[in-house]
């Protein structure tokens, strides 16, 4: 973007220099006094003066733009200021120069010319900061003088901050009576980022009274001559024409411009040139690029120039009006060049002589128009540093035409990635209260004024540091055409919707909550392709949006889905009830279409219910199942309208049959429901009457004789069984370990994929004791023949012979026994059957197994114990409790990760620990006579310690033999044990369980000869 330096002449003209051109001083122009070091780095403002009504009742406002001073080497032509203080702070520091304004989106501003002196009705920067310089009143201005622009300095102005003095550029003084000020009392107090400003009460003191006769001759102004580029001038001119209209000369009917009379030459005037009073221009060197622009955005000037004509047509058509709405005033004409020599801003030293000849050209290059006179006492709080544009004004109803056009232009650039700020957010400035603070901030509006889709709102601006200044209620003209265009824009909006105004109202400034717009509902955001997607396809893809939302009923889609559910096309039986049990219109349609595939004509209610339940798995929550049964009852009543009196009666009777089935065939403990109870529970439920008694008796008998069975998902059952039997399953499932097993996870069986088969053969099993050595009921103790398979740490019992790779049935899996921490011993005390051995598991269940031969019995015992010794993981320590009741610790079912050598050492350590604990327990029981429950618990603990000692002893002995054999084959272990010739170490005889041990007799039984008669037999006959 082209940038150039803009310098303002004393007549209000401007000249544009090329970007970053070297600066040099005019030979005639004095060099301004440099500001103190404390002023550098501060932020200044380009402001527009706020004043009261002008000659025609027009009011003006004031706006600031943040800027930062640039510094350069001092010019050798520094002249001491006649009013400079003697303090060191008043001396010009090195590196200061005149101020140049870099133009970038600066509005039509009233640039106040100050040469270190307070303007009429205002204060200089140094006085705002607490300076002590005496005020200098200025002479009266001509009638047309207040049309020129002024540049008022900010904290960045090259003025002394403490004890500030006037610039040395004004060396000619004019003596005469003071003229009344033309601006408001508080219209020009300085704009400070920290919110400081001179109070209006000090103005009278600062300006002095009528007796003051010292005035400044502002004829000799200083400037910073930079090379003027015609391209930069065209850009500046185009910017002004884009924002504020054409620069064509006023019409022939306009009043000719008035010129102020020249002031008499004052003291110290150079070459006797007289300059108009108040015409000394003070420049502020500012570069907006060096300041964090809080409320400004950039755009491409080339793109803006392309759309200039459209904006010009919208702006120039508005009559300039700052009075009441509906009153228009023609634009004030621009004055011609004032008499008297003045330094040219467009040339260097060589162009000084052509100053007066180029006056008319300077007028043509004028960018800013003059400002009107101001009314004193119009102090208003500053809303924001957002510039006020001519042609715009706050409105309580909406934006004006310029705002609409400008927002339309910015909207087109928003799509190109450029962010803008609305310039019409001025509504809250209309009528501030007299008691309000002079400073406040607001956030810029994120929404455009047109009824098009709202763009994403930018992040709210941080609270800005308040710049001192004022603004009037009617800063820009408000025309009737703007109201008409706004009315047309509102008429195009939908009924009942307010247009999103780009201006901030009081509510948007924190005084109230006002929604700026509403987003469309989420349902409208669904694309047409999604809405047209077939419901069946949604369900096939696993989508439940149609079912969950449920208010869009599609009969054709429901028919297609019902057909697929009935034929199980892409669905399982478990999915049918889920689709029929939803509480929405679409699911009701699907259920109605699904039940049409069933014909219940001529069937009793229980028969129809059995047929229906065979086709689907009645699953889900209670309310979902009740909805499915309601659909069934409706269909049954349609097929058999004569069987029952109403549809509600059919539904009531259907639910009663389901409850009766649960009561008669469930696992509940208690009294079963009788036929009389069933009939009595249904009294008065048939639409206020009773059901036929014979019907209820028939239904009760049918349910009692044959329970209702609904379909089970056979696919799920087959998959679970196949995964359990698969040698390489993807998912390992845990199955319950045997009949009567506890719910502990340590007792569950985990099929081991790829486990080795150590032995298989025929076995006959008898359950001798349930977990915790509880006696097995008599009806479950019988002997049953199986084919045993020792695979890993699980002993599988099958009905048929072992076949590698054969899948196991559910019954065979339930009969499986885990041998972790188990011990197999010869049942020497059992004499009813030969070749019987005991198998005691980790949960203290006891099984009796009968082998075909003695060798097979010995082989089963050896291999079961060796496998348990190799893979049983070390147990956890026993639980610690304050209770005296003994409880066995749980033993882990997972395989150990220790090597066989480490496993042997672990078993030997546990053997020593169990032996030591058993000795301590027996020593503690000496001399005590336990009674009742306490004695029984002590006996259980002693039996447990004895069993654990025997088990670890067997494990350690067998692993030592296996390691000595040096082979992983169990046949080698059996051969080594056979060569030892003793089974006492590896297979000691034991009883089935401690609770089943025969109690030893307190007195030894005396042996008697067979010929001796029994005691107490008397003379009875003896058997021969």
From Swiss-Prot:
Q: Where is the PH domain?
A: 756-869
Q: What S-S linkages are listed for this chain?
A: none
One GO process term, biological-process aspect: regulation of ARF protein signal transduction
Q: Which GO terms describe its cellular component?
A: cleavage furrow; dendritic spine; postsynaptic density, intracellular component; ruffle membrane
Q: Where in the cell is it found?
A: Cell membrane; Cell projection, Ruffle membrane; Cleavage furrow
Ranges for the region named Disordered are 25-98, 113-230, 246-401, 430-536, 976-1024
The lineage's top-level taxon is Eukaryota
Record's compositionally biased regions (Acidic residues): 300-313, 349-369
Q: Where is the composition biased (Pro residues)?
A: 71-95, 327-342, 445-463
Ranges of Low complexity composition bias in the record: 987-1004
GO terms for molecular function, please?
A: guanyl-nucleotide exchange factor activity; phospholipid binding
According to the UniProt entry, the coiled-coil residues are 898-924
Predominant location category? membrane
Q: Where is the SEC7 domain?
A: 512-706
A Pfam match is Sec7
Q: Where is the composition biased (Polar residues)?
A: 215-230
Record keywords: Phosphoprotein included?
yes
| Function, in words | Guanine nucleotide exchange factor for ARF6. Induces cytoskeletal remodeling.
Indicate the quaternary assembly. Answer: Interacts with ACTN1. Interacts (ARF6-bound form) with KCNK1; does not interact with KCNK1 in the absence of ARF6.
The family classification in the record reads: Belongs to the PSD family.
Stated name of the protein: PH and SEC7 domain-containing protein 1
Organism name:
Homo sapiens
Annotated gene = PSD
